[in-house]
A protein has these predicted regions:
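An N-terminal boundary/leader segment
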Residues: 1-53, 289-291, 364, 482-496
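Short helix-loop capping/hinge segments that flank enzyme active sites or metal/cofactor-binding pockets
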Residues: 71-91, 250-262, 315-386, 437-453
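Short glycine/serine-rich loop/turn segments
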Residues: 71-213, 264-266, 315, 401-419
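Serine-dependent amide/ester hydrolase catalytic core
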Residues: 13, 301-302, 325-433, 483-492
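Conserved hydrophobic/aromatic pocket- or pore-lining residues that grip, position, or stack substrates
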Residues: 29, 51, 79, 111, ...
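Short alpha-helical scaffolding segments that buttress acidic/His motifs in well-ordered protein cores
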Residues: 25-29, 308-309, 355-363
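Structural helix-boundary/capping segments
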Residues: 31, 35, 164-170, 175-271, ...
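Short, conserved phosphate/pyrophosphate- and ester-handling motifs at nucleotide-, phospho-/glycolipid
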Residues: 18, 79, 219
Length: 496
């Protein structure tokens, strides 16, 4: 039986029905990893021995009847900025290359309680700072659809692993689009939940007021199932929200009749590639024909989202990353005489260029002479953006938008021009600033065969509406754009 094309829920059903053992499921993942990993580079580390041992333990619990559920025995990959007890957690940075946590992130623990088997830690942009997964200390990850293109970022390793069929689903984190944009580039489904839905305990912080953990998978059902599993109130995270409505799978209903969907004119103007715009508007038409009410509207303030985001995120990063100094854990330079030299050389040698750029920017905007002019102004802009969304959601159930302005760029195209890379998040970062949920689903391909993703944005705690609309689209198109075959066999270089 070919297991690699199964979704997480499909695989879970076969494990429960005793058609497949947990060991067979894990071995199928590693067989595919052996086949494609050298080309794709989705993982920073693999835990084959530990995963096979865990598979035996989970199988025993399933056989005893003490463990059931849709994810029991199903393999998962974890983005390498989430702590995993006893397993190196690097944030794809040299400075944490030898860091082994003594505890696991709450989201990881929730998956393990549900019987998930962690097979490895995925590659990412260093400290989640980037949109291409090219800033990793462990080398760039490539897009399985075409190995000359990026998978997006910063959760590019998780998204590439799912797209390359190395694992049925994975966890990512989203600070400014880091789940939705790479999901779009890789032709998979990814959701950033409402801020506070998933505990940030054990997630190594980038921008604490923006970070949120979420799942990436091959279809909407998997995403809803995983989010239902990892969403929980956690006293260890002061921003965690106690929700009673996390039965997300109950929203998987093929029906959008009467749903009001707003399309922001500002998102479909200059800067949006025609090959991205066309399939998204066609997808909107599919929902309209199914009974949804589609209407254009103005969401003008979002044009200020990028400057506001990079001021706020960089300010929080400069504070969060000050703890990495070589004293208690992580990389420490060997060549120093004085303590201040050790700090300086450790951080200079341990951080990559993009991380240094954002730390410097953050330190600048927080400095006494510029705090009011930049940081305070950015916070006010953030509040105004939230107000603009509140006005929109007074009229609409959700907003339909692109997840990215283009399909996946070529490797190296954004590295030499950081501003170009930052603009790749133009449609996603306002969602983080407002703390809203957003889902990306595949809706087409461009002329090169690269995936196009559509983003649905909801009001706070309205993930169910997003899942319902996304699931309906999937049903109406019979998962036409979902990769359910081994595309990596055909992936390769474009002809000259």
């Amino acid at each position: 039986m070919d297991l690699k094309g199964l979704t997480a829920v499909e695989l879970g059903k076969k494990i429960q029905a005793k058609e497949v053992t947990v060991k067979e499921a894990v071995e199928a993942c590693f067989a595919q990893i052996d086949k494609v990993e050298k080309e794709v580079n989705s993982f920073v580390s693999l835990q084959k021995e530990a995963a096979l041992k865990r598979a035996e333990e989970v199988q025993k619990l399933i056989d005893d009847g003490t463990l059931s559920g849709p994810l029991a025995g199903v393999p998962v990959a974890i983005k390498d900025n989430m702590c995993t007890e006893g397993v190196t957690t690097t944030c794809s940075s040299k400075i944490l290359s030898n860091f082994v946590p003594t505890f696991s992130a709450e989201a990881v623990l929730n998956l393990e309680k549900a019987g998930a088997v962690v097979i490895g830690k995925t590659n990412m942009d260093e400290f989640a700072m980037g949109s291409t997964t090219e800033t990793s200390y462990y080398g760039e990850t490539k897009n399985p659809w075409n190995l000359e293109h990026v998978p997006g970022g910063s959760s590019g390793g998780s998204c590439a692993a799912v797209a390359a069929l190395e694992v049925p689903y994975a966890l990512g984190s989203d600070t400014g689009g880091s789940i939705r944009q790479p999901s779009s580039y890789c032709g998979i489904v990814g959701i950033k939940p409402t801020y506070g839905t998933v505990s940030r305990y054990g997630l190594i912080a980038y921008g604490s007021s923006l970070d949120q953990i979420g799942p990436v998978a091959r279809d909407v059902t998997d995403c809803a199932t995983v989010l239902e599993t990892i969403a929980s109130h956690d006293v260890k995270d002061s921003t965690s929200v106690e929700r009673q409505d996390t039965d997300f799978t109950s929203a998987l209903v093929n029906d959008v009749k009467g749903m009001k969907i707003g399309i922001p004119k500002d998102y479909f103007g200059e800067g949006l590639d025609e090959e991205v715009k066309k399939p998204i508007l066609e997808a909107a038409e599919v929902l309209k024909n199914a009974g949804a009410e589609i209407e254009e509207f103005d969401l003008e303030l979002v044009k200020y989202a990028i400057p506001a985001y990079y001021v706020i995120a960089s300010a929080e990063a400069s504070s969060n990353l000050s703890r990495f100094d070589g004293v208690k854990y992580g990389y420490r330079t060997k060549d120093y005489e004085e303590l201040h030299q050790m700090y300086k050389k450790t951080r200079s040698e341990g951080f990559g260029p993009e991380v240094k750029r954002r730390i410097m920017l953050g330190s600048f905007v927080l400095s006494s002479g510029y705090y009011d002019a930049y940081y305070l102004k950015a916070l006010r802009t953030k509040a105004l953006i939230k107000k603009a969304f509140d006005s929109a959601f007074a009229k609409y159930d959700m907003i339909l938008a692109p997840a990215a302005p283009t399909t996946a760029p070529k490797l190296g195209a954004s590295l030499s021009d950081p501003i170009k890379m930052y603009l790749g998040d133009i449609y996603t970062i306002s969602v983080n600033l407002a703390g809203l949920p957003g889902i990306s689903i595949p809706v087409g391909r461009d002329a090169k065969g690269l995936p196009v993703g559509m983003q649905l944005i909801g009001d706070c705690f309205q993930e169910k509406k997003l899942f319902q609309a996304a699931y309906t689209y999937e049903c109406l198109t019979e998962k036409k754009w979902v990769s359910m075959y081994d595309k990596t066999e055909a992936a390769g270089k474009e002809e000259a």
